[in-house]
Amino acid sequence: MRCLALDIGGTKIAAAIVKNGEIEQRQQIHTPRENVVEGMHQALGKLLADYEGQFDYVAVASTGIINNGILSALNPKNLGGLAEFPLKASIAKHTDKPIGLLNDAQAATYAEYQLQNFEQVSNFVFITVSTGVGGGIVLNQILQTGSRGIAGHIGHTLADPNGAICGCGRRGCVEAIASGRAIEAVSSQWEDPCDPKEVFERFRKNDEKATALVERSAKAIANLIADLVISLDIQKIAIGGSVGLAEGYLSLVEKYLQDFPSIYCCEIETAKFGQDAGLIGAAYWVKDVLLDKPEGTIYG
């Protein structure tokens, strides 16, 4: 079956035909920044028209939270005016094909899970450490989306009760300590300010301030991993994102994990899918859950 997959982010919307995990006819446009509600309706309509007659179903991976087809977020400001956008209904105006939607990190998780040996790994987590910290959880070979679509927002678990206020409004979330945004919040205040990319360059040169900042991030992720393993019996975790894949970061996370009792540890690997993880994961998930198992529940 051929899927029209859409990946809706804060700055771009990617679209492609996905068949058997392979990307075809990929295109990318800017997410509307002005008149955003009408602009999004128009953008979706154009993309559906571009691929008319070429797909059997639609799969959407989107930033934010998808609940009953409505787009929202823990921090609505991140959506730039698209909070409570009727995403599924907007797409349904242009096609009568089946439509499934889920969060982009959940979709990426499902893509990464397709590379695992299902018999050996039934409990799996994907963590993306980038501008923010997000992820997804697979338990008993089933991707967890939750009754409200929020399952997997692991970046908003507690890392430091005395830490910085997170964008979600809570104090001390993992995201407020480990993310690229959190790193930049500190490094931009230095006498010699820099962005996260340069922080890592300085870290690799053993700069004291940069090393302390990167270590702080890696410790938060190591503790997050330990919490996930001990609470959910996770067998393997894949780490991605611009921070998570930065040279030297994963080995630092693993170093801190070695300080814990072994029961808190599991196998860690780098994420294999790149920018198309959301497209591929959404296509697989909608096919597996909505089309191949019609008795299953679709959130989104």
Swiss-Prot record:
It comes from the Bacteria. Pathway: Amino-sugar metabolism; N-acetylneuraminate degradation; D-fructose 6-phosphate from N-acetylneuraminate: step 2/5. PROSITE patterns: ROK. Keywords: ATP-binding, Carbohydrate metabolism, Kinase, Metal-binding, Nucleotide-binding, Transferase, Zinc. It catalyses: an N-acyl-D-mannosamine + ATP = an N-acyl-D-mannosamine 6-phosphate + ADP + H(+). One of its GO terms (biological process) is N-acetylneuraminate catabolic process. Pfam families: ROK (PF00480). Gene3D superfamilies: 3.30.420.40. One of its GO terms (molecular function) is zinc ion binding. ATP binds at residues 5-12, 132-139. Zn(2+) binds at H156, C166, C168, C173. The keyword Lyase does not apply. The keyword S-adenosyl-L-methionine does not apply. Its EC number is 2.7.1.60. HAMAP family: ManNAc_kinase. Homodimer. Catalyzes the phosphorylation of N-acetylmannosamine (ManNAc) to ManNAc-6-P. Belongs to the ROK (NagC/XylR) family. NanK subfamily. This is N-acetylmannosamine kinase. It comes from Haemophilus influenzae (strain 86-028NP).
